[in-house]
Amino acid sequence: MSSNPFNPFEAALNWQRKTLENMTDAAETSQIADERLELMESVEVGQTPSDVVYEENKLELLHYDAEATGIEVAEEDKEAVPILIVYALINRPYILDLQEERSVVRRLLEAGHDVYLIDWNEPSRLDQHLTLDDYVNRYMDNCVDVVRERSGQDAINILGYCMGGTMSVMYTALHKEKVNTLGLMAAGLCFDHTGGVLEEWGSEEYYSPQDVVDTFGNVPSDMLDIGFALMDPVENYVTKYIRFAENMENEGFVENFGRMEQWLGDGIDVAGEAYVQFLEDVYQDNKLYKNELELNGKHVDLDNIDMPVLQLMGEYDHLIPPEASKPFNDVIASDDTRTIEFSTGHIGLSVSSSTHADLWPEVAEWYSERSTGGEEVDIEVESPEDDTVDQSESTDIEVDATDDVDADATEDDADAADEPADVDSVSGIGPTYAERLHAAGIHSVADLAEYDAAELADIAETTESRAQDWLDQL
């Protein structure tokens, strides 16, 4: 038996003591509650100085001013090739510039990059018929041309976030000559039971985006906000407010909480027709990943994406799980791809302290290593009414190879030439397609040639046009 038997009087006293302590804490907290709420309402966001250098309809193209920000970068460390950030059509882009120490924009500026950002702003009822073609081939293309003209560069770097990343893929596939590198941040690209709850909710079995647009015209931000919040209802409606109450005495915590709440409550409507296209073509039919997507009759051909590609994804992203992004690298032509999966969530990629300490310096370096800058060119940017622009030809540089070749290496190359080339030596056949082909007994290029496009498309689970592209290379 226990040497300390249960004492009901002591237990009652302990309970009363604990209750009194909790009441005292609550009373003290209530005394500062009004002050903390005022502090939350007074926080500022998006404070990095910028200039609007181009406007069209509602959109504004921002150019960030490192000098006005107080960021000093040595002349030799300044990058010639600028970065254009393409944000989603949902929410405001200042999540990428939330506060000084958690600003993606500032991290890039500090690394010497010249940074631009497209702020789409909110569409009116007059914009409900804007399509993805309008956003990608008109608005984005005009912004890219402005950045090219201002920088004197024939091709620029792009960084697309979330839906903006998906649209950046579309743009790059259609205008590859204008894109030096493509960075994608939590971009939804592959929806084959890989997109988590959002993909299931958006399934044509349960949801009709056309019905929403027929009812509202543009998709209301309140409807979108509630939908996103309900993906994690306990956290969004209970836990975070308990956490706020427990940390109310911490001014820094309250300020950060206020900034995030301001952004979460600052949603914008989405143009109706673009929303329908995005949900039906990208989510429900997975046309982008299958290389079947068309914008206004133009094929968004993933084989055109042959420049360096970087993918950033959050390990705990419940909006765009890593599995909705990773497979994309296998279906593009680029042989310079990199994937970074960081231990954070969808929003954490842009605002968590750990990403700013460890991830964004690495991203800035990735862009720097691939942004040597080409010959400056003069670019004519047409007025917003025009959909096309004159394009300058890229500069071709010939490099002479050395005549000194190691004899052993030459012999090794000769031996290798005698071996049948594997199917993954064909441009456009990445690891995923190669694995499917291998499983069907197709290991070499010679094996591949024994099949027609329809048979290969069925085996590799791709389109006949892509399979025919493989055969055309043989």
From Swiss-Prot:
Protein name, per record: Poly(3-hydroxyalkanoate) polymerase subunit PhaC
Domain of life: Archaea
Consequences of knocking out this gene: Depletion of both phaC and phaE genes leads to complete loss of the PHA synthase activity.
Function: Involved in the production of polyhydroxyalkonic acids (PHAs), which are water-insoluble biopolymers used as intracellular energy reserve material when cells grow under conditions of nutrient limitation. PHAs are composed primarily of 3-hydroxybutyric acid (3HB) and 3-hydroxyvaleric acid (3HV). Required for the production of poly-beta-hydroxybutyrate (PHB) and poly(beta-hydroxybutyrate-co-beta-hydroxyvalerate) (PHBV).
Extent of Acidic residues compositional bias: 375-404, 410-422
GO-annotated molecular function: acyltransferase activity; nucleotide binding
Family matches, as NCBIfam families: PHA_synth_III_C
InterPro entries registered for this protein in UniProt: AB_hydrolase_1 (IPR000073), AB_hydrolase_fold (IPR029058), DNA_repair_Rad51/TF_NusA_a-hlx (IPR010995), PHA/PHB_synthase (IPR051321), PHA_synth_III_C (IPR010125)
Gene expressing this chain: phaC
Classification via Pfam families: Abhydrolase_1, HHH_5
Key words, A-Z: Acyltransferase, PHA biosynthesis, PHB biosynthesis, Transferase
Any one GO biological process: poly-hydroxybutyrate biosynthetic process
Region feature Disordered, mapped onto this chain: 368-404, 410-429
PANTHER family per UniProt: POLY(3-HYDROXYALKANOATE) POLYMERASE SUBUNIT PHAC
Active site, renumbered: 162 (charge relay system), 317 (charge relay system), 346 (charge relay system)
Family statement drawn from the similarity comment of this UniProt entry: Belongs to the PHA/PHB synthase family.
